[in-house]
Amino acid sequence: MGGRLSDVSAYHYSWLGHDIADGITRDIRSGMDDLSRDLSDNFDDSFDELGREFDDIGRSIHDRLDDGVLNESTFSEIYARKLDLEVRRGKAVIVYDAPADKIVVSSEEDMALWNVYSEEDELKVTVGSKSWDSHDYKDTVIYIHVPADYRFEKVELKVKAQSNNKIINSDNGPAIVAEGLKAGKIEIDASVGAVRVTGADTGKLEVDSDVGAVQFEGKVDGDVDTECSVGAVKLDLAGAKADFNYEIKCKVGSITVDGEGFSGLSREKKINNGAAKKMELDCNTGAIEVKFH
């Protein structure tokens, strides 16, 4: 004869609920661990592919520098204490090879495809328009040449979608490459496309990835704040894990800090190492990986 749930004593009902909850929790955590491993594997594969694409971009850039006649705009340092770079179509490259006291923005493409001007002490560079005009289908590459020891007060690197439903892929997606970038603060906003910064030296780092991919390698003297929606962020920082205190939020995505994984957190996880610096990591369904060297 079948029993009813109400026939179970309160004591046994309590333990029954406890066992069911434990079973569900174990299943969820097992599933989240599997998902985390899958995301981590896909994350590594994606960045391997991204690395190859950046290498191809680098070769293309050097070929263009060798072959092209460039359009140039030159600014003295007092008009470029800050840099605001936004790429909606094509590629932008920051290199530290300019003469002293001069910052040069150049491209072999017509200046109708890119724009540069100084507003007070901020240099503003835009590649590609907000809409897909016919000439925007050309893959524009611009170069920002900076003096070897120059340190910006603040740098903003943004890759954005254009205002329509055109598909963005590795062939036409926006990308920024920066080597040896120095700034009091670096902000990276990857709505789409990709940003790679290597050999950087900054006082503070902020990264926001929507569906874009971000690679950052370098030294950060202060706090790090990283948010990732469905994109991917990879940080390779000078120093050690213990140099930071941590605030970690992760839903369905994957966060890895120096080999330790975090996923499916029901609430924010705080780690206090008694450090002078703080790292905030917030991931929705994407992936964040932090390594130290």
What are these regions (language model features)?
Residues 133-135:
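Acidic/histidine-rich helix-loop elements
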Residues 2-126, 137, 141-167, 175-178, ...:
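Short linear S-[DN]-x-LW-Φ motif typified by the pepsin-like aspartic protease active-site region
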Residues 156-201, 206:
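Right-handed parallel beta-helix
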Residues 181, 197-293:
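Short, surface-exposed interaction patches in beta-rich subdomains
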Residues 91-92, 164-165, 173-176, 193-195, ...:
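Acidic Asp/Glu-based divalent-cation binding sites
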Residues 73, 121-129, 264-272:
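Generic recognition of long tandem-repeat/solenoid scaffolds
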Residues 89, 98, 109, 120, ...:
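A mature extracytoplasmic/lumenal domain signature
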Residues 83-85, 169, 188, 248:
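Active-site alpha-helical segments that house and flank conserved acidic catalytic motifs
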